[in-house]
């Protein structure tokens, strides 16, 4: 093998190695930042996995919101119509956060309580995140809730 071919071979191998390393690093970064959406029923069934970071979607259960006066930490329950999951959040809640409204929270389970790092509330009366609407729709079908009750909140 002449020196020019050998040099070209080394360059090709170096580029392949660099490409493989870059692909591996990007893949690892994306895996760490992925947070799948689960309903309270799916979490209680064990679908979310222990110590994994995920998004919890559903409705804030009416009458469940609690916050001590002067404190930032809030406690509430998220429901999908079948199950309720207690949530703890120690930051400022969005202005549109209310009981009976759709919410998507990102965080982890700790001792039976979902500890949220981030909470997103729906932004108007007619919108519900598509993923939450789909998962809530399956709960409605399970309980034979009329289709009209499910159609008002889903984004089309």
Swiss-Prot record:
Keywords, comma-separated and alphabetical: Cell inner membrane, Cell membrane, Cytochrome c-type biogenesis, Heme, Iron, Membrane, Metal-binding, Signal-anchor, Transmembrane, Transmembrane helix
Chain intervals for the UniProt region annotation (Disordered):
135-156
Annotated Gene Ontology cellular components are: plasma membrane
Q: Give the top-rank taxon of the lineage listed in the UniProt record for this protein.
A: Bacteria
Gene Ontology BP, a term: cytochrome complex assembly
Q: What is its main location?
A: membrane
The portions of this protein that span the membrane are 9-29
Write down the membrane topology. Single-pass type II membrane protein
Q: Tell me the residue ranges located in the Periplasmic compartment per UniProt.
A: 30-156
SUPFAM superfamilies with a match to the protein in the record: Heme chaperone CcmE (SSF82093)
**Which residues of this UniProt protein bind heme?**
123, 127
| Cytoplasmic topological domain residue ranges | 1-8
- A Pfam match is CcmE
> What subcellular locations does the record give?
Cell inner membrane
Entry's Gene Ontology molecular function annotations: heme binding; metal ion binding
Q: What InterPro entries does the entry give?
A: CcmE, CcmE-like_sf, NA-bd_OB-fold
**HAMAP family listed in its UniProt record:** CcmE
What is the recorded function of this protein according to its Swiss-Prot or TrEMBL entry?
Heme chaperone required for the biogenesis of c-type cytochromes. Transiently binds heme delivered by CcmC and transfers the heme to apo-cytochromes in a process facilitated by CcmF and CcmH.
Similarity annotation: Belongs to the CcmE/CycJ family.
Q: What is this protein called?
A: Cytochrome c-type biogenesis protein CcmE 2
- The gene designation is ccmE2
């Amino acid at each position: 093998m002449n020196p020019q071919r050998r040099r070209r071979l080394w360059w090709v191998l170096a580029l392949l190695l660099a490409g493989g390393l870059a692909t591996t690093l990007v893949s690892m970064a994306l895996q760490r930042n992925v947070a799948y959406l689960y309903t309270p029923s799916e979490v209680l069934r064990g679908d979310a996995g222990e110590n994994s970071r995920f998004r919890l979607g559903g409705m804030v259960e009416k009458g469940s919101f609690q916050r001590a006066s002067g404190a930032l930490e809030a406690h509430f329950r998220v429901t999908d119509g079948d199950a309720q999951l207690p949530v703890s959040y120690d930051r400022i809640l969005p202005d549109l956060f209310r009981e009976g409204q759709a919410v998507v929270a990102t965080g982890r389970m700790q001792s039976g309580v979902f500890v949220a790092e981030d909470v997103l509330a729906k932004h108007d009366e007619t919108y519900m995140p598509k993923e939450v609407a789909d998962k809530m729709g399956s709960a409605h079908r399970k309980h034979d809730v009329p289709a009209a009750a499910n159609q008002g909140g889903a984004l089309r």
